[in-house]
């Protein structure tokens, strides 16, 4: 879990006339694992690193809030951070609900504020001063946020024109520095992310340095709508949701099940070749295990409520035990390591599992396959000695690169999060030598591998350095795919030890890795990445045979059976449609390859080959085309 960082004012110059500061009241969600989020205040280091674009977007959030306040003076304000996509601000307006029809009016007011070229003025104030100002404005949510700031920390406000906000930036110098923006959408958001709190209106927007960049991004968003995994998933019948099953609980339909099976097959083959051993763990466990791991009580809000069961103990007494659906696989894997004595000869020990986990995501945050409550994670824990660590970490990174090549992921970045030596024993486990050694080794692996990475200080997990893997889809949209973490704290909590060469006990290092993330998020990404046009090896329906007339049906059925027996996913169009209609249907269904069979093809034991999106590929002998298909499938070739 991320810990709350201390914040202080900071002055950061920029060639763009960028302002200074660091947001105090704004909280953001930082992804610490695939599908795992925690809330943390931005630190001083975060503010220093803020990019020019982040500053423009944060400033634009203030301009939007100022415009809303001009139009609806009774609006209550909560938070307004920048995001990867742009920015948002949370409002409570008792007598008005935002709709897209409001956007032109708000945007017009924002343009006026930008034209006024207002200065973003930062002031350091006392707690009493800020409280009085917020009380005078009747801003109840801001008053609660003020209480979050620890005693003794500087409190700053930013003012532009008549608008004042409890904030420490960062901002541009003037509203006129904002050159291109657009409001995007409105959504419901619970105050502080808790469903028991009031529901606010979250107004989203985006901003860019240039109008041309905004136009390009908007075009990309239009393409993203066309590639929306929820839309394509429904059209292709890959997955479904049902109210009786529950929100965030995807039902994988047969074609979606094929995607899962193919991805798991790839993972199992890759992991077997790399020396992993497969394990299987239960879907729930007793409370005590998660207390030992440290997930309880700190992660309790993201776990489903406990199940209480009355059990008869060995001595005949009855006891109520509390069980939790597992939100992560690692504690179970630690128990497998501890199931019998271990020797250095067994290390590295690599335990892998596509484990089912359950996260209690807020209903308002659920989003298709990207944010779910039931998920299957490509998880593994690697237990090793310090001497083995560098080779193991490199092997994990090599596995990522292999997967990226197979799935045609050309743009990616690894974000290497390190610790702050001054916060050892507070935010981070107090093992200075291990921190230095593991961070140096991780850094060395990244450099020698030539991997594109950025180093982010003071963002490591409490138990060790970590790498968050960002990937970009074919249309340039960024996704968080997976994580790779070093753990030299939790194994000790579980008492994990092995016998060394000197016959003494030592605690192993542990590498958590999930290179394919979860089925849900990864397949959601792949649907957009490929626009549903999966490569041959992954396509749910690899081949569809299209006989022109009934005279070709026996030949086509014999061909279908032969291909099916060879392990090819093939179907036969037995409809009475004309061949043009059959081709259109196959294209609409995103069937990868089509075999058109007419009288001439039947006589010559050949097929007229078509490939989805590429059209006619000519007439080819059956033996030749089948050999080609099988070779491409076996090689997991990209199209």
Please state what every model-predicted region is:
Residues 4, 29-76, 84, 90-639:
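NTP/phosphate- and nucleic-acid-binding module
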Residues 80:
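N-terminal single-stranded DNA-binding subdomain of primase/primase-helicase replication proteins
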Residues 6-9:
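Intrinsic, low-complexity polybasic segments
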């Amino acid at each position: 879990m991320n810990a709350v960082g201390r914040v202080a004012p900071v002055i950061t110059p920029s060639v763009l006339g960028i302002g200074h500061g660091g947001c105090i009241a704004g909280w953001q969600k930082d992804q610490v694992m695939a599908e795992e989020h925690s809330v943390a205040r931005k630190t001083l280091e975060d503010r220093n690193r803020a990019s020019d674009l982040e500053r423009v977007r944060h400033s634009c959030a203030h301009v939007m809030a100022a415009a809303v306040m001009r139009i609806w003076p009774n609006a209550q304000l909560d938070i307004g951070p920048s995001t990867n996509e742009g920015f948002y601000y949370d409002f409570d307006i008792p007598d008005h609900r935002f709709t897209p029809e409001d956007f032109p009016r708000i945007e017009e007011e924002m343009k006026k504020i930008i034209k006024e070229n207002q200065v973003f003025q930062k002031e350091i104030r006392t707690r009493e001063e800020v409280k009085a100002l917020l009380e005078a404005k009747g801003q109840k949510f801001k008053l609660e946020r003020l209480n979050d700031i620890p005693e003794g920390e500087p409190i700053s406000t930013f003012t532009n024109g008549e608008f004042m906000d409890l904030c420490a930036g960062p901002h541009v110098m003037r509203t006129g520095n904002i050159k291109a923006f657009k409001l995007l959408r409105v959504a419901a958001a619970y105050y502080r992310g808790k469903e028991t709190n009031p529901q606010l209106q979250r107004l989203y927007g985006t901003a860019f340095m240039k109008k041309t960049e905004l136009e390009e991004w908007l075009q990309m968003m239009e393409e993203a709508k066309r590639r929306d995994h929820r839309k394509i998933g429904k059209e292709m019948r890959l997955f479904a949701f049902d109210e009786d099953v529950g929100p965030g609980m995807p039902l994988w339909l047969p074609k979606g099940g094929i995607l899962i099976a193919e991805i798991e097959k790839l993972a199992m083959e890759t992991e077997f070749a790399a020396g992993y051993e497969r394990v299987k763990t239960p879907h729930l466990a007793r409370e005590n295990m998660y207390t030992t791991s440290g997930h309880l009580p700190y992660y309790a809000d993201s776990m489903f409520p406990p199940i209480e069961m009355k059990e008869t103990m060995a001595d005949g007494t009855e006891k109520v035990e509390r069980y939790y659906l597992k939100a992560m696989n690692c504690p179970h894997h630690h128990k497998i390591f501890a199931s019998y004595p271990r020797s250095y000869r067994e290390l590295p020990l690599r335990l892998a599992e596509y484990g089912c986990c359950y996260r209690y995501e807020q209903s308002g945050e659920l989003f298709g396959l990207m944010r779910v409550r039931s998920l299957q994670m490509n998880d593994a824990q690697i237990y090793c000695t310090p001497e083995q660590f560098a080779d193991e970490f490199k092997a994990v990174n090599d596995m990522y690169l292999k997967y990226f090549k197979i799935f045609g992921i050309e743009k990616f970045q690894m974000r290497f999060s390190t610790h702050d030596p001054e916060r050892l024993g507070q935010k981070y486990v107090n093992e200075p030598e291990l921190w230095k050694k593991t961070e140096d080794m991780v850094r060395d692996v990244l450099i020698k591998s030539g991997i594109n990475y950025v180093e982010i200080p003071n963002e490591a997990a409490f138990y060790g350095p970590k790498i968050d893997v960002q990937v970009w889809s074919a249309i340039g949209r960024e996704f968080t795919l997976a994580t790779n973490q070093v753990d030299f704290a939790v194994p000790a909590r579980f008492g994990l030890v092995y016998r060394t060469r000197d016959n003494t006990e030592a605690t192993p290092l542990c590498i958590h890795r999930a290179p394919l993330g979860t089925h849900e998020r990864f397949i959601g990404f792949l649907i957009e990445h490929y626009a549903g046009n999966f490569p041959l090896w992954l396509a749910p329906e690899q081949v569809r045979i299209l006989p022109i007339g009934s005279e070709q049906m026996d030949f086509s059925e014999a061909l279908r059976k032969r291909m099916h027996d060879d392990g090819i996913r093939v179907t036969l169009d037995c409809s009475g449609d004309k061949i043009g209609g059959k081709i259109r249907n196959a294209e609409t269904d995103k069937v990868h390859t089509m075999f058109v069979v007419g009288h001439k093809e039947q006589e010559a034991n050949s097929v007229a080959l078509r490939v989805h999106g590429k059209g006619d590929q000519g007439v080819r002998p059956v033996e030749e085309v089948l050999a080609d298909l099988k070779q491409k499938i076996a090689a997991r070739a990209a199209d």
